[in-house]
Regions:
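Nucleic-acid endo/exonuclease domains
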Residues: 1-143
Length: 143
């Protein structure tokens, strides 16, 4: 069976970490943003050795605090040409929000489940982004 990846970076990461299990199902709970909106989430991989779900990113996270904030911004951007560029999706997508990732991490932690964001090469993170992730307590690594 051929494994389908969401991005080339996920495929490359998996080739370098073949012991990881590709995750196609939703994480084992639901999550709630600051507006009370319930959402589901997926991780990219599961590490059976460390019992950790792993989300791979190759861009720094955006700062949209709620799913609706993200959708509102995407709606405005979409009005210009009828679609979002890949960069606009990363800069405004809820899936790429530092707050979404933090909600997922904190909720899973309450269930005794570890969740790690891996910023995989050639990710460039600003000092401001690193400071913010550290201040919020986001569990991440840069590889």
């Amino acid at each position: 069976m051929k494994t389908i990846y969401d991005s080339a970076i996920e495929q490359h990461y998996h080739q370098q970490h073949q012991h990881l299990q590709r995750q196609l199902d939703y994480l084992p709970t639901t999550f709630t943003d600051d507006n009370g909106v319930i959402f589901k989430a997926k991780a990219d991989f599961y590490d059976t050795i460390s019992n950790t779900y792993i989300e791979v990113k190759n861009r720094q996270l955006n700062n949209y605090k709620t799913k609706q904030d993200s959708l509102n911004r995407q709606s405005v951007l979409r009005q210009h040409r009828g679609y979002l560029t890949q960069l606009e999706q990363l800069q405004s997508g809820w899936n790429h929000s530092i707050y979404k990732q933090l909600i997922v991490q904190q909720t899973l932690s309450l269930l005794g489940i570890d969740y790690l964001i891996v910023f995989y090469k050639p990710t460039k993170l600003s000092k401001q982004a690193i400071n913010k992730m550290n201040a919020l307590g986001l569990n991440y690594t840069i590889q």
